[in-house]
Structure formats: C-alpha cells, structure tokens
Amino acid sequence: MVSEQIIDISGPLKGEIEVPGDKSMTHRAIMLASLAEGTSNIYKPLLGEDCRRTMDIFRLLGVDIKEDEDKLVVNSPGYKAFKTPHQVLYTGNSGTTTRLLAGLLSGLGIESVLSGDVSIGKRPMDRVLRPLKLMDANIEGIEDNYTPLIIKPSVIKGINYQMEVASAQVKSAILFASLFSNDTTVIKELDVSRNHTETMFRHFNIPIEAERLSITTTPDAIQHIKPADFHVPGDISSAAFFIVAALITPESDVTIHNVGINPTRSGIIDIVEKMGGNIQLFNQTTGAEPTASIRIQYTPMLQPITIEGELVTKAIDELPVIALLCTQAVGTSTIKDAEELKVKETNRIDTTADMLNLLGFELQPTNDGLIIHPSEFKTNATVDSLTDHRIGMMLAVASLLSSEPVKIKQFDAVNVSFPGFLPKLKLLENEG
C-alpha cells in the first residue's frame, strides 16, 4: 500500500535550526575513511538511507563502522585488506553510491556487482562507464549500460578526459579510479561542478591539483592516504527547503546554523539574492568546506529571474524548490540548461511541473528546464513524491501557501536525505 502524509502546517515560521549533515560530503568521508588504514571520526554525518547504503557496502568489504552519538567511528584495515564480497552490493536509491563506487571498485580491482532499487535501475550509467572503460576498467552494465554493474579485476591507466556533462558524480568516479593508477589523469570540465571530492582528497592527504576547470591527479595517489577526522557541515540542499519556506510565508524569520556554503554549491543563495530575497549570512568560517549561519525573512514582491549556465550547476539539486519560489515572483521566470534534472531520481523537470500544476501553479516544462509564471495555490489535490525525496519536501513547502491540508503520497521518500524533515518544519511553525 502506498504511504500518504497529510501536511497541515501554516505560518509564520520562526526560530533557529540546524539541518542534517551534507549528503555528498558524508558519502565521500565514509569512502575515504574506509580506504585509509586506521581510525577516522566523521562528525555530524547524514544518516539517511542513501549514506547507510554506502556504510553497508564498506562493512561488507571488511571495514568496521560504528555509530557513536553524533559521529561515525571508522576503523579500517586499509584498502589493501579489503575482502572480496560474496553478495551483490546493494546501493538502494543512491546514485552517488552507485556511480562513485563504480570508479572506486574498478580502481581496486575487486570482483563485485553493484545494484540498486527500481529507480537506480532506470538511471543511465553509460556516462560513468565510458570514461572508466577508457581507463581500462573491466566494468559492464546490462541493457545499454544500466545496473547491475559487473566489475572484474583490471589494471587502471591514467587518461586525459574532456567531460561530456557537468556532473560531479562522473568526475568523482574517474577520480576515485585514478587513485589506483600509476599514471597521471587530467580531467577538463565543461562547467564548474561541486568539488567536494577534490577538497576531501586533500583532507585525507591525497595529492591533487585543481584549477577552475582542470583537475590533475598524481600517480599512485592512494599510497598517500591517511586517516582523518572530518566535521560534516549542514547540507545546503536540505537548508534550501527552509530558505524557500521562510521567503514565501508571511511574517517568517528563520535562521539556519552551520550550513555548508561551498562556492560550487551556493547557487540557491545567489538566486535568492538576485530575486531580492531577504537573506543574510553571518558566523562565516573559511577552509576547505566553508560554513555560515543563514537568516531568511519573508519577502513579498520577489523579482523574476533567468537561471542558466553555471548557476544551474551550482543549484542543480535545489531547482525543484527554486521553481516553487519562482511562482511567487512578480513576473515570469525561466530555468534553462538543466537537462541533468532528467536523470535524477525522477525526471525532475516533468515531476516538478506536473505536481505543482496539480496544485494550481503554472509551470511549462521545456526540453532543458521550466518556464514559471506567477501563480498561486488553487486546489488541495492529492500529489505524489513519486519516490523522489526532493519532490516530496518541495511539495510540503508548497503546502504553506494553502489554507487547507495537503495530502502527499510516498512522502516517506524524504528519509533518503532528511529524516526528521517534517518535525523540523513543524517546530518552526510552533515557535512562530
């Protein structure tokens, strides 16, 4: 039976919160801590379903990972002592786990099979398999390169690779494979994509050179890896839902503490500022992964915007809730260059338009994005996350514009990235 959640929340929203740890960084911290021989502590990790799939796989490879209050303690024998798994490595709904481990396991040369849920089975893996095969990885998918992915031992060579899409997952799969090559690998990017893999390689003592659109690895880089402690900042993709909720709900005033504001991920902040939203950053820290507290206040008369190019790449996961924000602008907004949305958990161009249109908003899907007209919540029709966590949370935020409760099917999908999302939203309602 399909689960349903009735969302009955009204504003104003007021108070101070933190959001769960960054999903992208938690995945990478688990992977790197597992490769390094010794003990690493990962503080404030995200323990949603996706990151648990990554943890489960490394446990099968022989890594001891314990949950200790607000941290993970990773005791690893090191990559040289990894076991050959005797069962399929299940990645669930996690594209990050699937694609990054395709590169890492190919580099390790461990015979293994990666497979996920029905959603992962529909997501293309050819964009990862092509560069890995150029590196001489012995990896195959089924039916035109979909999961399961079958990996066999091979000797990885370095490559000079021009990225075909602006994708941090593809880039990271290549980088993880390159750790085990005795050659240099050079990656040329089309556009800036999130750089957590590069910054976290350095944190775990792995040498890497990165300029704006060019990344160069060092031969036999894996030999330099050392265990390290890592503090995971709050996930800006999760914070985005509260940012938009506060902006569109009258009299709201919300502060979110310890949010990661990596410049390759801060598109939501740039977009809100361009639209004239009342947003302030303070308590900023610097370093490999900068953080800040973010204060957001209700802002009427938001300005329309065209979101394209690098701004899309910097806000790719936030675009569904940004589309909702754009419905509250005083003119028509446009999202372009967002073809990548088609290969997420759902085709997010279509699902964003379909679900918001059901509620009375006016969005037109295009081949590479959305045209969004100023519009209001008109009906409390039942909507569906379609098992996409970000669509589910976006619809919950949309309900703030309704005077009636909204029913969302398959809302439990939000647990992929934000267990406790709804209680946190209700907490701000109660404080308001």
From Swiss-Prot:
Keywords for this protein: Amino-acid biosynthesis, Aromatic amino acid biosynthesis, Cytoplasm, Transferase
Broad enzyme group: transferase
Pathway listed: Metabolic intermediate biosynthesis; chorismate biosynthesis; chorismate from D-erythrose 4-phosphate and phosphoenolpyruvate: step 6/7
Keyword Transferase: yes
EC number: 2.5.1.19
Keyword Protein transport: no
Reaction catalysed by this enzyme: 3-phosphoshikimate + phosphoenolpyruvate = 5-O-(1-carboxyvinyl)-3-phosphoshikimate + phosphate
Binding site for 3-phosphoshikimate: K23, S24, R28, S167, Q169, D317, K344
Top-rank lineage group of the source organism: Bacteria
Record-listed phosphoenolpyruvate binding positions: K23, G95, R123, Q169, R348, R390
Localisation per UniProt entry: Cytoplasm
Function: Catalyzes the transfer of the enolpyruvyl moiety of phosphoenolpyruvate (PEP) to the 5-hydroxyl of shikimate-3-phosphate (S3P) to produce enolpyruvyl shikimate-3-phosphate and inorganic phosphate.
PANTHER family per UniProt: AROM/DEHYDROQUINATE SYNTHASE, PENTAFUNCTIONAL AROM POLYPEPTIDE
Entry's family note: Belongs to the EPSP synthase family.
Protein name from the UniProt record: 3-phosphoshikimate 1-carboxyvinyltransferase
Taxonomic lineage: Bacteria, Bacillati, Bacillota, Bacilli, Bacillales
Gene encoding the protein: aroA
